[in-house]
């Protein structure tokens, strides 16, 4: 999680909402990203890191609970595990597991990854609070307020 938090801090330094992600395989970080809203609404760090890793059986480590889009991406990338720091009450996607029920005998290869939440929650929340102090009128400030 420390590497994901470092990515989030880089995002904060760049004036972005501090969300960072890394992808780990075989105990090594193979991809990393932080949110760059200026790169587009879909440039979520989870998506960017998963795409850059281009591997199966990875662990996605992120400072914010992945949204539905990012959880689906983790499933489609065959991530084995998702670890996150801070819950996202308005759009967190890890609860999709409660509804994910592939049809019996389905040939769909996608499986819901193991999910671990709350790792370094306080540090991630602190970074979001720092962002709000520095950028109270940022485009996503109102949403970011739901995280602290």
What are the language-model segments listed below?
Residues 1-11, 73-148:
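Zinc-dependent deaminase
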Residues 1, 38-43:
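Active-site metal-coordination segments of metallo-dependent hydrolases
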Residues 22, 59-61, 81-83:
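A structural signal for isolated positions on well-ordered beta-strands in alpha/beta enzyme cores
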Residues 4, 8-11, 21, 31, ...:
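Small-residue (primarily alanine) positions within well-ordered alpha-helices
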Residues 42-76:
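Short HxH-centered metal-ligating active-site micro-motif
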Residues 30-37, 114:
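Short beta->alpha transition motifs characteristic of CBS
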Residues 19-27:
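Short beta-strand scaffold segments in enzyme catalytic cores
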Residues 14-18:
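Short, flexible loop/turn motifs enriched in small residues
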């Amino acid at each position: 999680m420390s590497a994901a938090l470092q990515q989030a801090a880089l995002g904060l330094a760049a004036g972005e909402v501090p969300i960072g992600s890394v992808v780990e395989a075989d105990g090594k970080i193979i991809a990393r990203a932080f949110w760059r809203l200026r790169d587009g609404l879909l440039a979520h760090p989870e998506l960017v890191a998963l795409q850059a890793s281009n591997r199966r059986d990875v662990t996605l480590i992120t400072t914010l609970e992945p949204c539905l889009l990012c959880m689906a991406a983790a499933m489609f990338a065959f991530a084995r595990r998702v670890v996150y720091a801070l819950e996202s009450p308005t759009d967190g996607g890890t609860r999709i597991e409660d509804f994910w029920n592939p049809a019996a005998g389905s040939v769909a290869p996608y499986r819901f990854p193991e999910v671990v939440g709350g790792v370094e929650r306080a540090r991630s929340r602190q970074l979001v609070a720092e962002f709000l102090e520095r950028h109270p009128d940022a485009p996503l400030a109102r949403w970011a307020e739901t995280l602290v």
